[in-house]
C-alpha cells in the first residue's frame, strides 16, 4: 500500500485507517516468530492495493469469459512464467486464493469421495487440509495417518512404506506445518509408485527454501506440488499449484476454475508475480540461507539454556520447543512471551499428552525477523530473551528487562519506515 493510498484511506475511513496504523505499529514493536508469517516488500503491498482489484477475469490468460482482460492476461502470464522458472516446473496455476484452496483443487482433480488419502497426523506436524476430521479432506475421504518415530522425532520411511502397503492410498501427502527436518521426496515417490498412488507435496512452509536450493525440490519426484505464496516465499497471502506433468496441469486448471473458484484475485496475482520476481534475484537466495542459519542459531541458543528442541535441532526455518522439561504448557509459554511483545504460537508435539488447546510445545520460526535484517547474533539474543522470560515467569524485573531488550532489537531493525497514516487525518 503506497503513502497515497494510505492518505486516501485516512480521509475516507479514519476508523479502518486507525486500526491499520495500530496493526502496523504492533508489527514494528514485536519480535515476529510465528513460523508461517513474514513481511512482504513494499512493492508487493503496492500491487495488492492497485486497480487490478476492479477486474473480473474468469478463465485463464487468452481464454477469458470477460472482455477487457488484455492487461490482466499479461500480469497473470508473467506470474505463471516466473513461477515455472523459479521452481523448475512445466506448469503453474497461480489462481488459488490460498494453500487450502490449492489442496482442495488437487483433491477434486485426482480423487473421488471415499478414496483413501494418507498424510501426516496433525499432532505430529501435518496440516488441517491433509485429512483432519474437522476439514473437508477428512470428511470426504478415508484418511490414513502416519507420524514421526518416537525416538528420533523424524520421519520413518520404512514405517510409512508399511502403512502405505497395508492401506493402499490413492494419494500420499508429504510436506508439513511443523516439521523441522529435510523431507526426502525421492523416498516418498518410491513408496507412492510401489502402491500406485499419486504423490502431493505441500511445501507451503518451505517454498522459499526450495526455490533457492536450500531444500531439495519436490518437482522431479511428485505428481503435484502445492504451496502458499507467503511464509518463506515472502509474497502475498495466496496459493499456487505446480507440476512437472503438463497434462496433469490441465486437470488442475479445470479443478481451480470452474471446479472450486470463480474469478481470480488479479491484484493478489500481481503481488505473486512481484514476489516471484524478487525470489529469482540473488539477494533472495542469500536471504533464504540466512533464514536457516538464524533458525539454527535460535535452536542452539535455546538448547544451551537447557530447553529441549524436537528432533534436537532444525534444518529449515522452524523449530518446536518441548516445554515439558520445565513443567510448562504451550499455552502458558505463548502467553508469557506475548506479554513481552514476542509473537509465537503454542503447538502440539509428536505424542503430545496435552490437548491442541493447551499443547506441550511452542513453535518458533525465523523468516519474518530475518526479513527485518537480523542475523545469528540477534537470534542468539532472542534465544536468551525467551529463556529469561520462560525460566523466570513470576519475576517482574526480568519481565521488564526482557521487554526493554525486545524494544531495543525492534528499534535497530525498523519495519516499513516509509509507511505512515497521517495522524491528523485520523483524528
UniProtKB/Swiss-Prot annotation:
Its GO biological process annotations read: glycine biosynthetic process from serine; tetrahydrofolate interconversion
Q: Which GO terms describe its cellular component?
A: cytosol
Which Gene Ontology terms cover its molecular function? glycine hydroxymethyltransferase activity; pyridoxal phosphate binding
EC number, UniProt record: 2.1.2.1
User: Which residues are annotated as modified residue N6-(pyridoxal phosphate)lysine in the UniProt record?
Assistant: 231
Primary location = cytoplasm
What InterPro entries does the record point to? PyrdxlP-dep_Trfase (IPR015424), PyrdxlP-dep_Trfase_major (IPR015421), PyrdxlP-dep_Trfase_small (IPR015422), Ser_HO-MeTrfase (IPR001085), Ser_HO-MeTrfase-like (IPR049943), Ser_HO-MeTrfase_PLP_BS (IPR019798), SHMT-like_dom (IPR039429)
Superkingdom as given in the UniProt entry: Bacteria
Question: This chain belongs to which protein, by name?
Answer: Serine hydroxymethyltransferase
Organism expressing this protein natively: Gloeothece citriformis (strain PCC 7424)
| Gene that encodes it | glyA
